[in-house]
Amino acid sequence: MESSRRPLGLTKPSALEIMEIEAEGISQSRLQLLNPIPGVWFPITLGFRALPNSRREKSFSLYKDRECLLPMESQLQSKRDIGIDTTDVLLKHLMASRSSYCPDGIFTISEQGPMLAQSMATISKELSGSQANRPTLRPLPILLKGTQVAMRLFLLGLRPVRFCLRVFMLKAQEGLHLLADLVRGHNPVGQIIALEAAPTSASLPLL
């Protein structure tokens, strides 16, 4: 005698349920989610991700304990598969909405700092076709602070600091020697250096 109870787990929808799904205009492929068994669907709500019941992990209960929203798809990801280049449009949209775009597709609305606003304004001018000079980076204050810290540590007599400074100086000298060898190996530059090194008539001693 067959049991009239509906078995737990993944079950194939009946013909009546399939007809109701088709009448609502929802395709069956959108209800099929990472299916290892052909012809079996997860009973999920459209736009939601169903998590398996923690109490019935072995039986995969049809009842959902929790539901979570699917992550929103960014404009660039949604239009990537149809072959449309939307990079320019997306940048202008991001600058207009004053939002910061993360590589994982999440938009976080936040106030821009002065440096970010200036760089975004420069990018917008370049996209519009007007000439704009990019702000040049100035690493001199950073180098000055680093040099001051290194000199203070050197004056304290720390042996690792002295060793690191010595290694940096040797590497810098090695780079200068390699650069000079490369300059000599290049014919046009070598000719220019030879012409500059040759004594001119003004530098010759008068007899």
UniProtKB/Swiss-Prot annotation:
It is found in: Virion. Its main location: virion. Keywords: Virion. The keyword rRNA processing does not apply. GO terms for cellular component: virion component. Signal peptide: none annotated. Disulfide bonds: none annotated. The keyword Lipid metabolism does not apply. The gene encoding this protein is included within the N gene (alternative ORF). Belongs to the coronavirus I protein family. Structural protein that is not essential for the viral replication either in tissue culture or in its natural host. This is Protein I.
